[in-house]
């Protein structure tokens, strides 16, 4: 997967430079509302229910300040990713018990006919496994800076 292909799932309206929420449930709701406000999902309540259900199976807080809540839902019409930052951090139940600051919400249609969902999840985890990339992402203040950081992570 190329940087451009990965970036095609993001968008300026799906870039949140500072989350207002300070709780896990609040973050999930705030990120789901980004998609709802954009008109990218059919039923915001259904989407939020799906995200919460997925979290109940086990936290998507990966550790090292990163959380990747994700899931497939009949509310989603297309695969989309929301990127959000929390400078203060949020207790997300991460594996290392550290607060999360970088959030990637991946939402895909229930019938993922393009088989995008799992490769996207894997690629994001791979990209943020690099400490230097995580540090640069914490400093982004615009969608342009975010896309540049992702391109650099791919060596482009």
Please tell me what each predicted stretch does.
Residues 1-156:
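Cytosolic covalent-transfer regions centered on His/Cys nucleophiles
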């Amino acid at each position: 997967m190329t940087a451009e292909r990965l970036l095609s799932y993001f968008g300026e309206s799906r870039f949140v430079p500072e989350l207002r929420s300070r709780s896990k449930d609040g973050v999930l709701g705030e990120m789901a509302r980004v998609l709802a406000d954009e008109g990218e999902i059919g039923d915001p309540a259904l989407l939020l229910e799906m995200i919460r259900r997925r979290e109940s199976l086990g936290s998507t807080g990966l550790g090292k300040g990163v959380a990747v809540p994700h899931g497939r839902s009949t509310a989603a019409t297309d695969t989309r990713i929301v990127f959000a930052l929390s400078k203060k951090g949020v207790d997300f139940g991460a594996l290392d018990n550290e607060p999360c600051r970088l959030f990637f919400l991946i939402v895909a249609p229930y019938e993922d006919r393009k088989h995008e969902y799992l490769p996207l999840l894997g690629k994001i985890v791979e990209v943020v496994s690099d400490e230097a990339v995580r540090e640069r992402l914490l400093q982004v203040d615009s969608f342009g800076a975010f896309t540049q950081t992702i391109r650099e992570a791919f060596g482009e």
